[in-house]
Amino acid sequence: MDLETSEISNYKSSVVLSKLASNEQHGENSPYFDGWKAYDNDPFHLVNNLNGVIQMGLAENQLSVDLIEEWIKRNPKASICTNDGIESFRRIANFQDYHGLPEFTNAIAKFMEKTRGGKVKFDAKRVVMAGGATGANETLILCLADPGDAFLVPTPYYPGFNRDLRWRSGVQLLPISCKSCNNFKITIEAIEEAYEKGQQANVKIKGLILTNPCNPLGTILDRDTLKKISTFTNEHNIHLVCDEIYAATVFNSPKFVSIAEIINEDNCINKDLVHIVSSLSKDLGFPGFRVGIVYSFNDDVVNCARKMSSFGLVSTQTQHLLAFMLSDDEFVEEFLIESAKRLRERYEKFTRGLEEIGIKCLESNAGVYCWMDLRSLLKEATLDAEMSLWKLIINEVKLNVSPGSSFNCSEVGWFRVCFANIDDQTMEIALARIRMFMDAYNNVNKNGVMKNKHNGRGTTYDLTPQMGSTMKMLLA
């Protein structure tokens, strides 16, 4: 009997594709990425689509892009595609080795020093390029672990780690459970508990991964916590990977403390076990340039990562431009100050708007997002209830926010909402939508039911007509 067309297609796929290509570890079906799809299908626009989905699920720092644009206008020689810079075209366009342009790695090392307050020095010879922080994280994991090995990761953590750290490496991520009762702070007790669980399951634990500043919390790790964690990893002879890609987004005190400071202060810590991931995507707002950095204190890791970097090099044209820019000390200093100022102002304005509506966020001082507490809106403290609320916000309120479950949060009802990738008008419209949503929610609580405009039975918040008139008023 002939096979159906779909059966033939499935059969061919199972034969042709590798196990890697057909596994489900990438994480693209997570609500985190589903929210992006909702935005892509109906993107908000101030002129062309006022009722579209507002993108608040993308952790981009667009508040100071104008400063970058102005610098580029003033420095045409930085680009090999201008009359002023064409003299460098032949040298830059030719094949380069995997170490990167010397002027680029030197500039990166200097920039890492500046974003850490000048308290530590970085060696340009230890700077290894990668295709964004995604490539840098995967490169490190491939250097440090084998398939089946595991890394401890505090929750909540960046959803992309499932792709970056697990998908192609076969490495496991073991959660360190952090709770809202202490503002999701990492404790040694929680680390020890996660470590013991891994040991009991006969899992080989190779290291611990930190994001500092934290995505999605927007908080930083204090010096004492970093010391305790580095002592723990040192005593257990496991690696400590510190993802510091948000280092320059700290906009309020306390100041950022890099793991590099900690190991410089404590000679008992084995530096060979400590590694840093850096990037320009968040600090400068260059996610499209795909500039990721592996910085390791371990010579063998540096050498191995450099070999692997051939699969994800930063283009020499990009290196050339950034070497010019990051070597402009006056500009970099002014940019970092102004960027922090704008992030602080946007954070304060956005969280104040939420607070006026009755929504609280975890207090934070870094990053480009807030950790929003919507637990009071859940019908029950379950994952299903969180997903129902999230779908309501996506489909009816038309805001792409990310549910806490996609960050492996140990508690339901928390959502990450990004505030630095939209302009002021769009932010005001987003707040207006949230306000109307909360009014509708409060009306339900008061009257017991909210009518669905189509069938009168109830549970759908159809706010679009109200939003349309409100947004026109905001834009007037």
Swiss-Prot record:
<dbReference type="InterPro" id="IPR004838">
    <property type="entry name" value="NHTrfase_class1_PyrdxlP-BS"/>
</dbReference>
<protein>
    <recommendedName>
        <fullName>1-aminocyclopropane-1-carboxylate synthase 4</fullName>
        <ecNumber>4.4.1.14</ecNumber>
    </recommendedName>
</protein>
<keyword id="KW-0949">S-adenosyl-L-methionine</keyword>
<dbReference type="GO" id="GO:0030170">
    <property type="term" value="F:pyridoxal phosphate binding"/>
</dbReference>
<dbReference type="InterPro" id="IPR015422">
    <property type="entry name" value="PyrdxlP-dep_Trfase_small"/>
</dbReference>
<keyword id="KW-0456">Lyase</keyword>
<dbReference type="InterPro" id="IPR004839">
    <property type="entry name" value="Aminotransferase_I/II_large"/>
</dbReference>
<dbReference type="GO" id="GO:0016847">
    <property type="term" value="F:1-aminocyclopropane-1-carboxylate synthase activity"/>
</dbReference>
<keyword id="KW-0266">Ethylene biosynthesis</keyword>
<keyword id="KW-0663">Pyridoxal phosphate</keyword>
<dbReference type="GO" id="GO:0008483">
    <property type="term" value="F:transaminase activity"/>
</dbReference>
<comment type="function">
    <text>Catalyzes the formation of 1-aminocyclopropane-1-carboxylate, a direct precursor of ethylene in higher plants.</text>
</comment>
<dbReference type="GO" id="GO:0009693">
    <property type="term" value="P:ethylene biosynthetic process"/>
</dbReference>
<dbReference type="InterPro" id="IPR050478">
    <property type="entry name" value="Ethylene_sulfur-biosynth"/>
</dbReference>
<comment type="pathway">
    <text>Alkene biosynthesis; ethylene biosynthesis via S-adenosyl-L-methionine; ethylene from S-adenosyl-L-methionine: step 1/2.</text>
</comment>
<dbReference type="InterPro" id="IPR015421">
    <property type="entry name" value="PyrdxlP-dep_Trfase_major"/>
</dbReference>
<keyword id="KW-0292">Fruit ripening</keyword>
<dbReference type="Pfam" id="PF00155">
    <property type="entry name" value="Aminotran_1_2"/>
</dbReference>
<comment type="similarity">
    <text>Belongs to the class-I pyridoxal-phosphate-dependent aminotransferase family.</text>
</comment>
<comment type="subunit">
    <text>Homodimer.</text>
</comment>
<dbReference type="GO" id="GO:0009835">
    <property type="term" value="P:fruit ripening"/>
</dbReference>
<dbReference type="InterPro" id="IPR015424">
    <property type="entry name" value="PyrdxlP-dep_Trfase"/>
</dbReference>
<feature type="modified residue" description="N6-(pyridoxal phosphate)lysine">
    <location>
        <position position="282"/>
    </location>
</feature>
<dbReference type="GO" id="GO:0006520">
    <property type="term" value="P:amino acid metabolic process"/>
</dbReference>
